[in-house]
Amino acid sequence: MSNVDINHARALVYQLLSSLFAREIDEQRLKQLTSEQAQLFWTQLGYASEFSAPVANIQKVLNGLTSDEALLELAADYCGLFLVGTKHSASPYASLYLSPEEEPLLFGQQHQQMSEFLHQSQLQVQSHFPEPADHLAVILAYMGHLTCHSEDAAQLSFLNACIDSWLAKFVAKVVECDSKHSNGFYSALATLTLAWVQQDKQQLEQAIN
């Protein structure tokens, strides 16, 4: 594969992970995620040993969503984990993990920083996604953009400062809170995201050095 092909594949993974943290899975999205093309994508991603377990869990849950009730239960899991904002949830905002304040404000420093990154790239958070710019979905989507539009050093700098600096804490919180739910979809998604970011970071470091 050429560097262009590799970066395109990396962008696809970041965009996929971003989309799954951005909103609940509805019937239309489920069809996309379980299509023949998507199944091939999941299988290829799962070939890597560090991704195989979470990918298998994700595929198992997606292929088992065969009723409206099951979809609603997964949507409730998403809401309980990411939208409620209690001690039993895992808020997906960087500021809550990076701010030294005991009760950091949304739309704070990390939001402003990400907004500036987006502005510099002539991008913005879409109007139908009314969340602070330091939401994990926005950050992962921006990293996907960088893979095809920035040098390796700039990608690594952003990854270290804006993702790797807090992702492990967030993932640990997701796993802790999601353990109450039977299918563990979001635990698997979070675990996959961390493994992917760690591998991508390692490959960027090797490419630079």
UniProtKB/Swiss-Prot annotation:
One annotated GO biological process: protein folding
Q: Which UniProt keywords apply?
A: Chaperone, Cytoplasm
GO annotation, cellular component aspect = cytoplasm
Name of one Pfam family that matches? Nitrate_red_del
The subcellular localization recorded is: Cytoplasm
Q: Which domain of life is it from?
A: Bacteria
* Coiled-coil region(s): none
Record's function text: Involved in the biogenesis of TorA. Acts on TorA before the insertion of the molybdenum cofactor and, as a result, probably favors a conformation of the apoenzyme that is competent for acquiring the cofactor.
Q: NCBIfam families in the record, alphabetically? A: PRK04976.1
The protein's name is: Chaperone protein TorD
Organism listed in the record? Shewanella sp. (strain MR-7)
Q: Which gene encodes it?
A: torD
